[in-house]
Every structure is written in C-alpha cells, then in structure tokens.
C-alpha cells in the first residue's frame, strides 16, 4: 500500500463574513464587490499568487516560532475572520509591491520566488523557493516538500 504524504499541521482557516463558513486558506474572492478599476478589484482578479504566498508564510508561522515575523505574528494559530485575513493579505501585498494599475496579470512566479527567498534570507530561514518548469521529478519534489511539512504552491 502506498504511503500517504500530507501536511501535519492544520491549514490556514478563515471564517467568511457572509456565510460564517470556514475556508481552508485565503480567498481572493474576499475582495469581491470592489469598484471597477480599483486596487481591490485587481486583488480579486489577480491575487491568487499573493494568497498562495500569504498562506505559505502563515502556515510556516503556525508551524514554528522560527518563521514568525512582524508581518504574520498577530495572525498565527487561530481561525481568522475574513477582515483579519484581508488585513494580513494587505501586509503581504505591500511587501510584494502590489499589482500595478493596468496590469494584464498578477505577480509572476519568479517574483513570488524572489520575494519568498528575500524573506527567508532576512529571517535566516533554512528554506529556499525554486521555480521549475520541467515535470521530471515533479511528484518526487512534491512528496519531499510535504514530507518536510511545507505546503506546495
């Protein structure tokens, strides 16, 4: 029987304002209903990479004090309200430099990788993000990350 591999800690949880349901991870839909052309509309339409990175930082911080920073310290190890998550998202959004008006897409994977590595270097984490386009070894890399209790994005 194959070995099951997955995260060992509970994933990020956010209580939705409109339904009181709990999501696993953030949702760029939290910015729904924003005026056309607004920054919040850009977050809704192109913020999936930022959500992924924000969730990764928060998961690591939930996992170990070593990964807590001034950016995530107030949001660890609890169910966040939707408004709290949006505040946290905005902190990460500013760290990443935001999404410029008129952008045709969200943040590139390379930019997310560099931002993660910058944060890891500043905080002396022994982690490094890598971006790879080849599918060779993909499942082995995913299994390795999950084996180290690191979400795959």
Where are these regions (language model features)?
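Conserved active-site-adjacent core of cysteine acyl-enzyme catalytic domains
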Residues: 82-153
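Active-site-adjacent structural segments surrounding the nucleophilic cysteine of cysteine proteases
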Residues: 1-109
């Amino acid at each position: 029987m194959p070995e099951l591999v997955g995260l060992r800690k509970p994933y990020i949880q956010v209580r939705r304002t409109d339904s009181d349901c709990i999501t696993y991870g953030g949702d760029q839909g939290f910015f729904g209903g924003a005026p056309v052309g607004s920054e919040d509309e850009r977050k809704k339409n192109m913020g999936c990479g930022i959500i992924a990175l924000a969730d990764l930082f928060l998961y690591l911080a939930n996992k170990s004090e070593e990964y807590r920073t001034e950016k995530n310290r107030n949001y660890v190890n609890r169910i966040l309200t939707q408004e709290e998550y949006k505040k946290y998202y905005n902190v990460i959004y500013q760290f990443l430099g935001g999404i410029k008006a008129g952008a045709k897409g969200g943040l590139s994977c390379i930019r997310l990788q560099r931002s993660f590595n910058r944060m890891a270097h500043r905080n002396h984490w022994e982690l490094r993000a890598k971006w790879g386009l080849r599918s060779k070894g993909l499942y082995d890399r995913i299994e390795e990350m999950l084996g180290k209790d690191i979400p795959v994005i």
